[in-house]
């Protein structure tokens, strides 16, 4: 049994619920939202396609009391970034939302592992830790998991290779102050600095990487997606589900 509660059924929360269902790592998923009808609709929509994924997961909308016994609770609630807006500009509003949710959810799921996905994620994770009184090892921010995935995607595009062969990481705070420790970055064990000589396309020579350009690209990726489609939710949802998989 692996019960997961998701608070917030906007684009990110709903996509996490759907993805968890397809991954088959949850036996029960509870959706909680201030907009009860939205939560009911998302649960129904996912549930009605469940037969294509084994049909073993119980998915339903509920209230905080329904989170009792959850192994994992994922917080996605809060306002989302608008085009041109920074994550830090969301801080006070989303801090207030997190503080209002915190006592209600921890009352019923005091032993759960909490994954904070809402932005600004590092600030909200710290607030949740300080306000909840829960052990530090029960609270996880999604942090730079998404940034790392974006970096690997960019490097895989650059060298035309599978993303799973890229072993590079983004450290620090999620967003503009993050950084890449290039000295440990490698592709299938080959240090990244040696890759231009070793990874080539017939008739072409790969130019040396511009580390600063790559880091800037990664930092601006979220804003680039928001400018084009209004919100980011697929990649961040995949990052949240990856954390759940690691805990499974």
Give residue spans per PLM region.
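C-terminal substrate-binding/catalytic lobe of Rossmann-fold NAD(P)-dependent dehydrogenases
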Residues: 132-138, 148-248
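Extreme N-terminal starter segment of soluble prokaryotic enzymes
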Residues: 1-4
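Rossmann-like NAD(P)(H) cofactor-binding subdomain of soluble oxidoreductases
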Residues: 86-152
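Glycine-rich Rossmann-fold phosphate-binding loop(s) that bind the pyrophosphate
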Residues: 9-10
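N-terminal Rossmann-fold NAD(P) dinucleotide-binding loop
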Residues: 13-14
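Conserved NAD(P)H cofactor-binding loop of Rossmann-fold oxidoreductase domains
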Residues: 77-79
């Amino acid at each position: 049994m692996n019960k997961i509660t998701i608070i917030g059924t906007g684009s990110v929360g709903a996509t996490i619920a759907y993805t968890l269902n397809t991954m088959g790592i949850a036996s029960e998923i509870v959706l909680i939202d201030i907009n009860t009808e939205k939560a009911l609709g998302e649960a129904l929509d996912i549930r009605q396609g469940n037969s294509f994924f084994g049909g073993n997961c119980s998915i339903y909308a509920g209230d905080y009391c329904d989170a009792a016994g959850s192994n994992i609770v994922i917080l996605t609630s809060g306002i989302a970034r608008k085009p041109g807006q920074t994550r830090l500009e969301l801080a006070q509003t989303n801090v207030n939302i997190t503080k209002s949710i915190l006592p209600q959810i921890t009352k019923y799921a005091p032993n759960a592992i909490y994954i904070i996905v809402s932005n600004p994620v590092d600030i909200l994770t710290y607030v949740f830790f300080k306000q909840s009184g829960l052990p530090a090892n029960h609270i996880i921010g999604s942090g730079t998991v998404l940034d790392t995935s974006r970096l690997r995607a960019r490097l895989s595009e650059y060298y035309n290779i599978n993303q799973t062969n890229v072993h590079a990481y983004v450290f620090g705070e999620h967003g503009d102050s993050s950084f890449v420790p290039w000295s440990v970055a490698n592709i299938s064990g080959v240090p990244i600095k040696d890759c231009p000589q070793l990874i080539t396309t017939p008739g072409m020579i790969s130019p040396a990487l511009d580390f600063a350009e790559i880091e800037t690209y990664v930092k601006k990726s979220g804003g680039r997606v928001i400018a084009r489609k209004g919100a980011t939710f697929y990649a961040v949802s995949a990052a949240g589900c990856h954390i759940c998989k690691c805990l499974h």
